[in-house]
Amino acid sequence: MEFLWAPLLGLCCSLAAADRHIVFWNSSNPKFREEDYTVHVQLNDYLDIICPHYEDDSVADAAMERYTLYMVEHQEYVACQPQSKDQVRWNCNRPSAKHGPEKLSEKFQRFTPFILGKEFKEGHSYYYISKPIYHQESQCLKLKVTVNGKITHNPQAHVNPQEKRLQADDPEVQVLHSIGYSAAPRLFPLVWAVLLLPLLLLQSQ
């Protein structure tokens, strides 16, 4: 019976240890002003993209930031120019949603059971860029994600403290982070413990 529950227990532990890396995707995030904004993850970690969100009516609807995000190759990342609509990963197009900011999640897993799912490899980098919806901006928002590495600290770019801005994921930026909710809730260790309990009881009999 050991060969049944031991692999499941290992899977439970690996899932419980997965980290979530949050990126606030908007032009006020000073991280996007760096030339090489990079997030380092491990396999089975999550990347949570928090879309632009406005709590009140102080910003006109036409001025609200909306983006189409693409997953692209390195050369397209450098040029900040996607080559195909097939590269669309998400749309951030609900900046005034009543429930709060949209959260879009990517799981960096080696294999996926879904036909349209993405698979990732250790030691590889993956690239995301965005294009504004309904308005034009000169700033290119782009992100590099490297699988299997440690998070490095990059100097924070200068930000005008008087500038009205959206949230940023840099902990040194004194802003209040709203909480978004994922459509795929994370499995907690307690749930796995309940699922594994019948197998452990069978072994003890």
Curated annotation (Swiss-Prot):
The keyword Secreted applies. Disulfide bonds join 51-92, 80-140. Glycans are attached at residue 26. GO terms for biological process: angiogenesis; aortic valve morphogenesis; cell migration; central nervous system neuron differentiation; endocardial cushion to mesenchymal transition involved in heart valve formation; ephrin receptor signaling pathway; mitral valve morphogenesis; negative regulation of dendritic spine morphogenesis. Undergoes proteolysis by a metalloprotease to give rise to a soluble monomeric form. N-Glycosylation is required for binding to EPHA2 receptor and inducing its internalization. Residues 18-161 form the Ephrin RBD domain. GO terms for cellular component: extracellular region; plasma membrane; side of membrane. Its main location: membrane. The keyword Ligase does not apply. Residues 183-205 form a propeptide. Expressed in myogenic progenitor cells. It is found in: Cell membrane. A lipid is attached at residue 182 (GPI-anchor amidated serine). SUPFAM superfamilies: Cupredoxins. Residues 1-17 form the signal peptide. InterPro entries: Cupredoxin, Ephrin, Ephrin-A_Ecto, Ephrin_CS, Ephrin_RBD. Keywords: Angiogenesis, Cell membrane, Disulfide bond, Glycoprotein, GPI-anchor, Lipoprotein, Membrane, Secreted, Signal, Tumor suppressor. It is a lipid-anchor; GPI-anchor. One of its GO terms (molecular function) is ephrin receptor binding. Monomer. Homodimer. Forms heterodimers with EPHA2. Binds to the receptor tyrosine kinases EPHA2, EPHA3, EPHA4, EPHA5, EPHA6 and EPHA7. Also binds with low affinity to EPHA1. Belongs to the ephrin family. Cell surface GPI-bound ligand for Eph receptors, a family of receptor tyrosine kinases which are crucial for migration, repulsion and adhesion during neuronal, vascular and epithelial development. Binds promiscuously Eph receptors residing on adjacent cells, leading to contact-dependent bidirectional signaling into neighboring cells. Plays an important role in angiogenesis and tumor neovascularization. The recruitment of VAV2, VAV3 and PI3-kinase p85 subunit by phosphorylated EPHA2 is critical for EFNA1-induced RAC1 GTPase activation and vascular endothelial cell migration and assembly. This is Ephrin-A1. The lineage of its organism: Eukaryota, Metazoa, Chordata, Craniata, Vertebrata. The gene is Efna1.
